[in-house]
Structure formats: structure tokens, C-alpha cells
């Protein structure tokens, strides 16, 4: 592949890690952010210590404070901003772009109020003449491991497989491999909804429950993620792949996962506002819980774990009470889809 220029919108942990992958592949990387001190640090110190204390970034990775400058002449744009601001940033991109680009996103969540998937948000805000079909970059991937070039395999999903293949070639190297997929709904819902289950898995750990309970919430969590995704139009096979069970395992079992850590702290009795403040990073599973719960109600999808976590976060229910409600609920067949 010839050298490409990519603007990464969002200098967080994942945006920075993906920037390093692209830089390793010989591409020109521009990281845009709205915190001047962070951009100055990337340019002057070649670090992003808020997320990676011991990592030195390549000097060719440049930070940008001005969005128009970051987008000037690029081949592709990668959104890695929090879900709640994706629409706002997309509006700004639509105003600043002067030519057609490949548009990708690597964020995992649903828009809080509309419950829309992020590719839908990007399609609405960026005119078709300025973009490709959206490509979703998602899968089991801790930024802390990717940044040190540990082996990582994820998916590139798009309605247009040719564009997905472009992204596959853009990122893939000896430690980072992408597989193409045309099930955008499945890949996006899997990436968003697994954060809810990770919060629950962390809470079980914080409460002192063992491996049996953790395995159960991952398995049953995958079932209800699949239920909702299929109701939205996804291919059920996607949930047995990298962006489905793969991402659920890595997020639902690891201390690297901010959603798991948030759940762990809640399980230990800490208040949500304290957990969010101490984390210092966006916990997508919190807002996604509300969106998924409301979607499930709207579509008539049975999601008991999501409902239990919703009650704990938004209705003040005790975690043990929520667990008891699941354990003593109506007996059901394991493979029921409603």
C-alpha cells in the first residue's frame, strides 16, 4: 500500500495506540485533540502520559489543535472520540472537509439520546459526497497491549467490502491484523453492548464471586447481546467472532478494561460518581446501559442482565438485590430468543 495520511480524532489511549500502528506501517499520522496541553506534550515530549506513562511515541506522530489543519489533504479520518460527542465532532468535520475521504470510527457505544449506532450518526452528519461508506474498526483490543506491539486481531466492518479491505491493508502488520466484515450492525452492537456486561462482571469480582459466576455472566451476557443485535438486523454469526465473544472476553475479564474496573469498584461499595471521578476516563458502559435498556424495551427483547445493571446504576437498586432477581426469576430454556 502506498503511504497514506490519516487524521485521528481523539488523543485518548486507543486513538494514540492506533496512531502508532499506522505510523509503524509508514503512514503519516495526525492526532487532533481539544486539550492544548496534551497536543503540546505529543509534539514536544513525544508522550501521552495520561494514558501511557512509559511509552515514547515516534517523532513522526504529530498532534494538531486546529481541526481544519489536521484534515487538510488527508486520505482517511478515524473517529476515536467519546460516544456522546461523536455527533458534535462529525458536524465540525463536515464543515472543515474540502475533499472526499475514507471515514472510520473505533469508538464503542450507542448515542445516548437517539440510541443510534455511531456509523448512523456519521452518515447523518457527514455528506455522502465527502466520505466513503463508514468503516467500523472494532474487536478485542486493549490499548495498553497494542501500544507495546502485543498481538492484536480485530475487525474492519463496512457495507462496502472494498473500503473495508482498504482499512484492512492500512492497519495490518506483523502484530496487528484485521479481518473484513460486512455486518456493520453486528460489529457495532457487539462492541457497544459488551461494555455493559463488563461492568457487571467487574461488579461480581468486587463482591467476591468466583469464576463460575464470571463465566455465567459472560455466557448469558453474550446471549442477550446477540438477542438485541439480531432484533436490530445483525447477523448472529458475528457475535461468535472477534468483535463479539472476543471483545466480550477481553473486556469482561481484564483489569485493563475501564468498564470492568468501574464495575469492580461498584461491587466494592463505591458510589458511581466517585468511580467516574477516580477513573478519569469515559466509562462507555454506563451510558450504553441506559441506551440498551431503552432499546430492549422498545423492541421487546429480553435482557435481564442489562436490566439489572440499569436498575443498579439508574434506579439505585442494590447489586445483591439485582443478582437475586436474576437468580430467582422465571425458569427459561437456555436458547430462547425472546
UniProtKB/Swiss-Prot annotation:
Belongs to the NAD-dependent glycerol-3-phosphate dehydrogenase family. GO terms for cellular component: cytosol. SUPFAM superfamilies: 6-phosphogluconate dehydrogenase C-terminal domain-like, NAD(P)-binding Rossmann-fold domains. It comes from Streptococcus suis (strain 05ZYH33). Keywords: Cytoplasm, Lipid biosynthesis, Lipid metabolism, NAD, NADP, Nucleotide-binding, Oxidoreductase, Phospholipid biosynthesis, Phospholipid metabolism. NCBIfam families: PRK00094.1-2, PRK00094.1-3, PRK00094.1-4. It catalyses: sn-glycerol 3-phosphate + NAD(+) = dihydroxyacetone phosphate + NADH + H(+); sn-glycerol 3-phosphate + NADP(+) = dihydroxyacetone phosphate + NADPH + H(+). Pfam families: NAD_Gly3P_dh_C, NAD_Gly3P_dh_N. PROSITE patterns: NAD_G3PDH. NADPH binds at residues 13-14, 108, 143, 258, 282, 284. It is found in: Cytoplasm. Pathway: Membrane lipid metabolism; glycerophospholipid metabolism. One of its GO terms (molecular function) is NAD binding. This is Glycerol-3-phosphate dehydrogenase [NAD(P)+]. Disulfide bonds: none annotated. GO terms for biological process: carbohydrate metabolic process; glycerol-3-phosphate biosynthetic process; glycerol-3-phosphate catabolic process; glycerophospholipid metabolic process; phospholipid biosynthetic process. Its EC number is 1.1.1.94. The active site is at 194 (proton acceptor).
Amino acid at each position: 500500500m502506498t503511504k497514506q495520511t490519516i487524521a485521528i480524532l481523539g488523543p485518548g489511549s486507543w486513538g494514540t495506540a492506533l496512531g502508532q500502528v499506522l505510523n509503524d506501517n509508514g503512514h503519516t499520522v495526525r492526532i487532533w485533540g481539544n486539550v492544548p496541553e496534551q497536543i503540546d506534550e505529543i509534539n514536544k515530549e513525544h508522550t501521552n502520559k495520561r494514558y501511557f506513562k512509559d511509552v515514547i511515541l515516534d517523532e513522526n506522530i504529530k498532534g494538531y489543535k486546529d481541526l481544519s489543519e489536521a484534515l487538510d489533504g488527508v486520505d482517511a479520518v478515524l473517529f476515536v472520540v467519546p460516544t456522546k460527542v461523536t455527533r458534535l465532532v462529525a458536524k465540525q468535520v463536515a464543515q472543515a472537509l474540502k475533499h472526499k475521504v475514507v471515514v472510520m470510527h473505533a469508538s464503542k457505544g450507542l448515542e445516548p439520546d437517539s440510541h443510534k449506532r455511531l456509523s448512523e450518526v456519521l452518515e447523518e452528519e457527514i455528506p455522502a459526497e465527502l466520505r466513503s461508506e463508514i468503516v467500523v474498526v472494532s474487536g478485542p483490543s486493549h490499548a495498553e497491549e497494542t501500544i507495546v506491539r502485543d498481538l492484536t486481531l480485530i475487525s474492519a466492518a463496512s457495507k462496502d467490502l472494498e473500503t473495508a479491505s482498504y482499512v484492512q491493508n492500512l492497519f495490518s502488520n506483523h502484530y496487528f491484523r484485521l479481518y473484513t466484515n460486512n455486518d456493520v450492525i453486528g460489529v457495532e452492537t457487539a462492541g457497544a453492548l459488551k461494555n455493559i456486561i463488563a461492568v457487571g462482571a467487574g461488579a461480581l469480582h468486587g463482591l467476591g464471586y468466583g469464576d463460575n459466576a464470571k463465566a455465567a455472566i459472560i455466557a448469558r451476557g453474550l446471549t442477550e447481546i446477540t438477542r438485541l443485535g439480531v432484533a436490530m438486523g445483525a447477523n448472529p454469526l458475528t457475535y461468535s467472532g472477534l468483535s463479539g465473544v472476543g471483545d466480550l472476553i477481553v473486556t469482561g475479564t481484564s483489569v485493563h478494561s475501564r468498564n470492568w474496573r468501574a464495575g469492580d469498584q461498584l461491587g466494592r461499595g463505591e458510589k458511581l460518581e466517585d468511580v467516574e471521578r477516580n477513573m478519569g476516563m469515559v466509562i462507555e458502559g454506563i451510558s450504553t446501559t441506559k441506551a440498551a435498556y431503552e432499546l430492549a424495551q422498545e423492541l421487546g427483547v429480553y435482557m435481564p442482565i442489562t436490566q439489572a445493571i440499569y436498575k443498579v446504576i439508574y434506579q439505585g437498586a442494590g447489586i445483591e438485590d439485582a443478582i437475586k432477581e436474576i437468580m430467582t426469576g422465571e425458569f427459561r430454556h437456555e436458547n430462547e430468543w425472546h
